[in-house]
Amino acid sequence: MAASLIDPSRAPVAFGRRAVPQLFEELQQRPEAARRQRALNSLCDLMHDPERVYQTVTGGFLEQVKVLFQDEDADVRTKTCDLLHVLTSHSVGRQALLSSSLLPPLSQLLDDPSSSCRRSVHRVLKRLTLLPAGADALLTLVPKLMLKLRQEKEEEEVQALILSTLSSCSYQDPRPALANDGVSLLGHILSHRSTNIRRRRPSLMALSVCRDGKEQVCEQNLLPVLVGLLQDEDLEVQVNAVGVIMFTVTITTGKQQCLDLDVLPVLLDFVPKKKEEEEEQDEERRRRRKALVLYSLRALAALAEAPGGRHLLLEQLPVLEARTESEEDQDIRRSAQSAIHVITWTP
C-alpha cells in the first residue's frame, strides 16, 4: 500500500533541513538523466517553501545548477529553468539570482533547441523584471529579445513573455529598444490577431515616454492604428492604446495628428462614469477602468493646448465638470480639474 503512494516522477526527499542538501548532492553525482529529472522535480516542490528557498540561497547551492544548463538532456535543462522559475517567485530568490553568476549562461539558453527550455528561460527573465534591478540587468538582452520577436519563430506564449520583459526593461531605460527599431517592431504587433499579444503593448507605451519614442510613433504613422484600437472590445487593449496616445500628444506633431484623426469624441466617451464602472467587482478591472479614464483626461488636457483642441473641448466642459462634482476617486477628480483648467485658460 505504501509503495503505491510513491510518486515515480520525484526523488525521495530527506527529512527536515537535510532535504535540499541531499537533492543537490544527488545532482552533483551526475546520475542518469531520469534520476536528475526526479531530483529537480523534488527541488521544485521544495522551493514553494520560503524556508527552503532561503536555505538554498544562503547555503551556496544556487551556483551548483550552472553545470545543468549544459546538460545533454533537454528535459534536465528545462527542469533546471523551472527550478529557477519557482525560486524567483520569492523576492529573496530573485535577488540571489541577480547576484549570482548564472545570468550569462542562462541567457545562452534563449537559443536552446528545445522550445520548452526556451519558454522556461523566458518565464524566469520575466520574473526577474519584477525588480528594477532585474530589468536593469536584462537591458543588454534587449537587442536579442527584439530579434526573436522579429523572427516570429516562437509560439504565442513566448512572444507574450518577451513583450512583458521588454516592457519592464523599456520603462527602466527605453534607449536599447529604440536603438533597435523597437517602435516599428512593436507597432507591427498592434494589429496582431491575438488579443493576448495586443494586450502586451505596455512596451510601446514605455517607449513613448521619451521624446524620441513619441517622434517615432508619429513618423511610423502608428497613431491611426492606436486610435482604431480605442474601439477594441478588450479593456486592456484600450488602456494601452490610450496610454501611448497620452504620451504622444505631448508633442506638437502628436497633437496635430490626433486632432486630424478626430480622436476627441472617442476620448471624451471614456470620461463619463458608466454603469459598468460603478458595478465592477473585480479589483483588477476596476484598476484598468480607472487607468482608462485617467489616461483619457490627461490626453484631453494635452490636446487642449492646441487651439483647435481647446475650441472643440470648450463645448464639452459639462462632461468634464461632471467628474469633478460627483467623483469619489481623488486621482480622477484632480485630472478632470487639470483638464478643465487647461481648456478654460486665457492669456
Language-model features and meaning:
Residues 1-347:
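Long amphipathic alpha-helical tracts in eukaryotic proteins
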